[in-house]
Amino acid sequence: MAGRRDRIQQLRGSRIAIAIFVGILIGCVCSVLFPNGFFNSGSSLIANEERISKSTSTDGLASCESSERVKMLKSDFSIISVKNAELRKQVRELTEKVRLAEQETENARKQVLVLGSEIKAGPFGTVKSLRTNPTVVPDESVNPRLAKLLEKVAVNKEIIVVLANSNVKPMLELQIASVKRVGIQNYLIVALDDSMESFCESKEVVFYKRDPDKAVDMVGKSGGNHAVSGLKFRVLREFLQLGYSVLLSDVDIVFLQNPFSHLHRDSDVESMSDGHDNNTAYGFNDVFDEPSMGWARYAHTMRIWVFNSGFFYLRPTIPSIDLLDRVADTLSKSEAWDQAVFNEQLFYPSHPGYTGLHASKRVMDMYEFMNSKVLFKTVRKNQELKKLKPVIVHLNYHPDKLERMHAVVEFYVNGKQDALDSFPDGSD
């Protein structure tokens, strides 16, 4: 028992010695790490905070001293911000134009791919044929002078073109007044003689005088309505080659609205009709009766009244240019009426010995693009139809054109309800 107590006492003594040693060791470490003591370290932190506070106060004084400079900078920044906003707006507008141009280019590329590659037909009711042919690549070398003029006058690569000589000044003057009244900007007169140039200048209307061409000049300077009308198929070709869509207009037309807001632009040719009702304007099944054939006496035929060659819209496509070439060539070899040839080329199908024109076509709404037969035979006698305001009125069915043009202005522009009443349906 005595030996056991001695071992316990020795163990306690060694523990005390170890504790003393550890305490001394910790004290040495603290003296090295904190030579100024714990409380002096806290004082140092306080001093640092005071230095920081003094520094902040100094900065505050400096900022107060430069407040005027800050105000000037803010004013400059405000001015720059306004200018920057204007520039951003211009960039957005230009970006949108580029996007639209790229979209048109992409659509044309897709059309070429569709036309040049094999495709599979979709499910029933989903297949649609290609109606809108791709436009040609513009070629400014064809007529650099005209290209510069169209770049200034055309809107969205579209232009109204009117061929005129001095024989039609009274009607043209009335048409120009209607164009200005509506606010149409992209309107161009092709002056066929010197007198017409002077007339256009006096009316402040944009005009274009072609380079000398004997074949055109001879007719243009002295020809009547029909002769001049036939020239357009030669003249319009350059417009299409330059990449512009053309809305051809005769002079016996009154503009009451901007026609470009009423076009579909999905076909090569978009034309007003000479028809006077739904059947004649848009087509109908005409049954031919031949009693001698007995059981087969009835033969079905498709009929439509002609497209009017005095007001039509052409997209700059190969079929459109082909149409102009065909009509111009036929007219150069015969005394045919240009409107008859225009429709023959549009509607005759390919058959043995003849290759037809593969152009897509659309008939304009006959109440928007109204001929004078529709107006005087139907519309003026119908109280509901009289409330409609057409886009144009074409006095193509009547020889007393100028008088009726004035009456159209009186009725649709000035509101004179009886302005159309004194005229007969047809001509005397």
UniProtKB/Swiss-Prot annotation:
Record bears the keyword Ribosomal protein: no
Tissue expr: Expressed in roots, rosette and cauline leaves, stems, flowers and siliques.
Main location group: Golgi
Residue intervals annotated with topology Lumenal: 37-428
Deletion phenotype: Reduced arabinose content in the insoluble cell wall fraction of meristematic region. Reduced root hair length and content of arabinosylated extensins in root cell walls.
GO biological process: cell wall organization; root hair cell development
Motif segment (DXD motif): 250-252
Pfam families cross-referenced by the UniProt entry: Nucleotid_trans (PF03407)
Glycosylation sites: N278
EC supergroup of this enzyme: transferase
Keyword Hydrolase listed: no
InterPro entries in alphabetical order: Nucl-diP-sugar_transferase, Nucleotide-diphossugar_trans, RRA1/2/3
Residue intervals passing through the bilayer: 16-36
Record function comment: Plays a role in the arabinosylation of cell wall components. Involved in the arabinosylation of extensin proteins in root hair cells. Extensins are structural glycoproteins present in cell walls and its arabinosylation is important for root hair cell development.
Protein name per UniProt: Arabinosyltransferase RRA2
Source species of the chain: Arabidopsis thaliana (Mouse-ear cress)
